[in-house]
Amino acid sequence: NILASWPKHTKTLANNPNFIMKEQPLRTTVIGSYPFPGWLLHASENLDAFGSNDIAEAQNDAVTAALSDQLSSGLDVVTDGEQTRFDFNLSFYGYLEGISLEGESPRKFGPPAHDQRGKHEITGELLAPRGLGAVEEFERLKNIAGPLREGRETPLVLKASVPGPFTLSGRLLPNEQYPDRYAITEALLPIVQKELEGLVAAGCQELTVDEPSMSCYAYNSDTKRFVDIFNRTVEAVVGKTRLSTHLCFGNFKGHAVGYRRIAPMLPDFLDFSVDEIHVEMANREFAEIDRIAEIAERMDVAVGIVDVK
């Protein structure tokens, strides 16, 4: 997904000498995962046939290709294309202890839809002693991007993304210890918070916290509670990186999952502690574009201009 944003608000970064943002009317970046190149897709479907070094080589090559594509397109803020993730958030469950990973899809036939993704059972205390892997992904991106930074007239800005705790909680089944989705979210919150702190310590200049579940369910949920959860998640990194959140309505096999309206998010989501909000626009034919002005009074707005669906 290609995004364009009009940079105006940098209030949380006013005292950060390490942050560099180009003076220009529009900044461009990407959201979400690039498609896997054929070699990485083949490796991901035949892991037993490859050694660990083979997999690392395939991933490095895929990140290099995604990065090269973004640079040749002239994007201002680049990512690793999430080439080491099988999904923007599903891969993170492999880092969690205290869960039993769901195996095969609960439904394999019929039209593609969200009910083809199963959920994981919670078997104990939710922990992530190895982190969530995002810091290692960012270190790989830095190493690959290093030579490309030389000789550039403008700084090359690298961005990382991590799903927020409410979105992560969506694929975990409640139990006696964690009786509902909010209890699961609270258990995941410090795990995500620690990952964000690790990314900032690694030198991440731009950081997106993906919370599409909040935008999907804003129409029938306590949006003030969402804001409280989000702000507690990011409070330790506010002012230390350019912070954004991505709000969309789902894109599993080209299908939305949530009520596709921005209106239910406002005005409460304007209290998010972020410099920028990403809003889904292109695949909704720029419906509610008038809402951008309302958001822009409080923070920068990044608008999706390429329809990935």
How would you label these PLM feature ranges?
Residues N16-K309:
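Domain-level signal for soluble alpha/beta catalytic cores
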